[in-house]
Amino acid sequence: MAFLPKFDSAGLVTCVTTDAVSGDVLMVAHMNDEALRKTIATGEAWYFSRSRNALWRKGESSGQTQRVVEMRTDCDQDAVWLRVEQRGAACHTGRHSCFYRKVEMAGEGGARLVFVDADRLFDPAAVYRK
Amino acid sequence: MAFLPKFDSAGLVTCVTTDAVSGDVLMVAHMNDEALRKTIATGEAWYFSRSRNALWRKGESSGQTQRVVEMRTDCDQDAVWLRVEQRGAACHTGRHSCFYRKVEMAGEGGARLVFVDADRLFDPAAVYRK
């Protein structure tokens, strides 16, 4: 059975990346054909940045790389699930996961954010300065 | 801290839904403002179907509903992570998760799909016939 990813009009599939140990969702990102190929070939996570319009090896600036334990695809092959060993933190804010806040009801149909994990594993200002 | 979802040009955020017990990724879908509000207000998962261009309560046809245990959002608030109690199967093919196949290298840079979980918990032909 061939892997035939169904790219959207921008040439991308959605990628969900989880921590292979804890199961936590670390991040949601996108991959183009080249990012998929490089991820499969190297066993390291590569993505495509929509804001920078560029291929991107996870951790190339921060050192916070992701080793792929397993890659899956969904029923219609327009999404990919990576289970990874995360080195350090996945989030550019320095948190282990990008999903470090939960959404809680706040009356009148509103909602507020509450920190689940505020700890920073690195200092973004130090890591990303050029 | 207010929850201020960052909708894309189509008015959607990406939603990753995981099984609160196993941690498995069940599905990737989208939510518009109304789907988010209804999910928060009712504690049941609502999505927006891009193919049908319609709001959709998960399980309204199949009975395979999702009770929300926790909702999180990511660093830039353009994605949501739902941890749910899945009743039956999340996938329209009858499998528990939409991610029932893994992607494996197949030499020459190619890749093939291998079933991780082929079992169907319901018969789609019976459930979705009108």
From Swiss-Prot, chains A, B:
One of its GO terms (cellular component) is cytoplasm. Zn(2+) binds at C75, C91, C98. One of its GO terms (biological process) is L-histidine biosynthetic process. Gene3D superfamilies: Phosphoribosyl-AMP cyclohydrolase. InterPro entries: PRA-CH, PRib_AMP_CycHydrolase_dom, PRib_AMP_CycHydrolase_sf. Pfam families: PRA-CH. It is an enzyme of class 3 (hydrolase). Its EC number is 3.5.4.19. Homodimer. Belongs to the PRA-CH family. Catalyzes the hydrolysis of the adenine ring of phosphoribosyl-AMP. This is Phosphoribosyl-AMP cyclohydrolase. It comes from Bradyrhizobium sp. (strain ORS 278). The lineage of its organism: Bacteria, Pseudomonadati, Pseudomonadota, Alphaproteobacteria, Hyphomicrobiales. The gene is hisI.
